[in-house]
Amino acid sequence: MIEEEVLKIIKPTEEDKKGIEKVLEIIRERLNKLDFEVEGSFRKGTWLRQDTDIDVFVFYPKDVGKEYLERNALNDIINRIKDLDYTLAYAEHPYVIVNINNVEVDIVPALRVESGDKAITAVDRTPFHTKYVTSHLDERGKDEVRLLKRFMKGIGVYGAELKVQGFSGYATELLIIYYGNFRKVLEEASKWKHPIKIELTKPMKIFSEPLIIPDPVDPKRNVTAAVSLKNIATFSIAAKYYLKNPSIEFFFPSKKVEEKVKGDVLILRLNLDEKSSEDIVWGQIKRSVNKIERALKQYGFRVIDVQAWGDTNNITIAVQLESKNIGQYYLNIGPQYYSQTIEDFIQKNDNIWVGEDGRLYSIKERKEYDAETIAKKNIVLKVKYNIESYWLQNTEDQQIMKFLRKTPTWLK
Amino acid sequence: MIEEEVLKIIKPTEEDKKGIEKVLEIIRERLNKLDFEVEGSFRKGTWLRQDTDIDVFVFYPKDVGKEYLERNALNDIINRIKDLDYTLAYAEHPYVIVNINNVEVDIVPALRVESGDKAITAVDRTPFHTKYVTSHLDERGKDEVRLLKRFMKGIGVYGAELKVQGFSGYATELLIIYYGNFRKVLEEASKWKHPIKIELTKPMKIFSEPLIIPDPVDPKRNVTAAVSLKNIATFSIAAKYYLKNPSIEFFFPSKKVEEKVKGDVLILRLNLDEKSSEDIVWGQIKRSVNKIERALKQYGFRVIDVQAWGDTNNITIAVQLESKNIGQYYLNIGPQYYSQTIEDFIQKNDNIWVGEDGRLYSIKERKEYDAETIAKKNIVLKVKYNIESYWLQNTEDQQIMKFLRKTPTWLK
């Protein structure tokens, strides 16, 4: 069975666990006397081997407020670990990342609230998620979560970050709790048609997103609010195809791909000067991708596909057009001969004629007909960056090959 | 006054009239004892100087039928003029063209019917048209018709033949009879919005054409049924512009035009082997122009304009595209992820991906992406022809220059 094979790879051993416990011992000592708890997939037992961060939350009374967390609490934590290898990171508010023996530990200050629906910052809900999941998943259930996570990683729909807009770990856990096991989740997902409602609890709000999983610990929140329709659709199709023809390729796509350049492909290589938060950079990259596509279409190009990939500093945007030569001039459709506006049209236009339909037509010059210029103009990054751009001739780059091939290897 | 100047040029002198009368004397002798009459603009006194054919109709009792006209009557006429310079021509049925001193005389066999609405062939109505016009137009009215004819010739909307799809001589006469004079026709035409109804008599049928002038001698027929909307619109616009700013340019467009090539312009030069009737050839040319435009659009080209010009043997079709490079591949939009048809789509397509909207997309190869091939394939001529085609670089050809400029010189 494929799934057993996969579990052998992804299920942590006792040794893996001990390694992480050893790291945690160091952190526990440092946070002595603080109100802290281990959260996240390690605590819930749904983590993947060699593929996890450890989340340690430090709680403060809710009355201290957000600003206390961001200054005093953070400073206290930093003082306790400053001799270790650490960096500062930002989500809704700042937290500390400590690296010990190549294990990443996120130390997150949070407010202690009475229940999930009383959360003041997004992270305050986390201990309630932990409680909900640990009390609803048995040992087999944890492995089912692991399979689902790895499957979603394999097909590229795992990760709540803006860059992915995929499923969070918590979402995979809720799916397993709701449907029972990995196979059952796939069976149901293969039949999805949005809006999809998965109600472990009654929603306390009307949600408009395509996939709706009201949070059992805070039912006015949709756990999968940020999952894109593209990822929902991809997951549904992958589920259908996996059930028909299970293969390790879904979990660990490995095939090297090759494809020729079809149409005209513009490659934009961006190099960001400053280090910014991933979600901030990718928010801007996603906006840029949309703007580039919209602008090119507006200028008359037929766009096949625009995609972006990369990390937080080196980003590639690929723009695929049916043709980069759309011509300098375009047909301009004017008013009917009996319209009040014909004199204005005739005055403002050149190359005017009357069509068989009684309308006036003219030829107009495009304001811009160089796709490269249009694409570059529509990159909206708030940090400084260098850009290198070229029309693709041929390539060895596997990422570009994937962009050209498009079809996922697990599909065909 | 412009119009007086124009009349000086177009109004025949006594000498012109005598010249034609001399030609007619020869024809009258030849048709001795037949029931013949002079019809057409010469008879009606609405002909233009150095710009007329003479129509002579030979009438037979209506009981002899169409076939008698086409054989016996025609042969009799030919026998009488066979020593002169003559050719055979075809409209609804055959007639004889005799050339005497560079004056063209059309000798047309027709059936003698009691009234216009009893016409068996289209030409049987003609003597009733002649009677109607001569009894409704005075001398000044005839000059007004001449002005209107010359104006329509100048702007290219005169001529009932399929090649032009413009106004017939009879239509111009009815317009003057209805509105009173040339200026009044223009004033009204400048305000036209189709459907336009000009009722010298109550229509005996519901007409669907944009311009409706029920024939006073046969009210179930629309005199302007064959006038294209393009010509109606052109006439309306020209009327409006002439009234604002009268100029000889409307009557005798003379300006040499120049224009650069905008977009990609394909020139197709057709040379027809056989001599065919103009209306038959131009029916096929018009169909070809439409087919070329439709096919190019269907294959994904953005068509600016397709036009044809020439005579009955040498015809030019010009095809203007925004760009001839539309690329070998195109974006193919597939079904939503939840559709029954996705498996079929995935099986039949390559380069498949899921879009942000949850749809499947793929890249497809165009069956044809060479505009020249598509244009040539869509020429539907039933006679043999040679074709020469090329992408326009630059030209001295005034017809091509006019095609490139488009804007009529009288407009701007």
Swiss-Prot record, chains A, B:
Q: Name the top EC class.
A: transferase
UniProt xrefs under Pfam families: CAA_C, NTP_transf_2, tRNA_NucTransf2
What positions does the entry give for Mg(2+) binding?
D53, D55, D106
What keywords are annotated for this sequence in UniProt?
Answer: ATP-binding, Magnesium, Metal-binding, Nucleotide-binding, Nucleotidyltransferase, RNA repair, RNA-binding, Transferase, tRNA processing
- InterPro entries, alphabetically? CAA_C, CCA-adding_arc, CCA_tRNA_nucleotrans_2, NT_2-5OAS_ClassI-CCAase, NT_sf, NuclTrfase_I-like_C, Polymerase_NTP_transf_dom, tRNA_NucTransf2
What biological processes does GO assign it?
A: RNA repair; tRNA 3'-terminal CCA addition
Residues that coordinate or bind CTP:
S41, K44, H129, K149, Y158
Which cofactor(s) are needed, names only? Answer: Mg(2+)
Q: EC number(s)?
A: 2.7.7.72
Give one GO term, molecular function aspect.
tRNA binding
Provide the catalytic activity annotation: a tRNA precursor + 2 CTP + ATP = a tRNA with a 3' CCA end + 3 diphosphate; a tRNA with a 3' CCA end + 2 CTP + ATP = a tRNA with a 3' CCACCA end + 3 diphosphate
The UniProt record gives the binding positions of ATP as S41, K44, H129, K149, Y158
Listed PANTHER family: CCA-ADDING ENZYME
**NCBIfam families the UniProt entry points to:** cca_archaeal
Q: How does it assemble?
A: Homodimer.
What family does this chain come from, according to its entry? Belongs to the tRNA nucleotidyltransferase/poly(A) polymerase family. Archaeal CCA-adding enzyme subfamily.
What else does UniProt say about it?
Answer: A single active site specifically recognizes both ATP and CTP and is responsible for their addition.
What name has this protein been given in UniProt? CCA-adding enzyme
Source species: Saccharolobus islandicus (strain M.16.4 / Kamchatka #3)
Q: Which gene encodes it?
A: cca
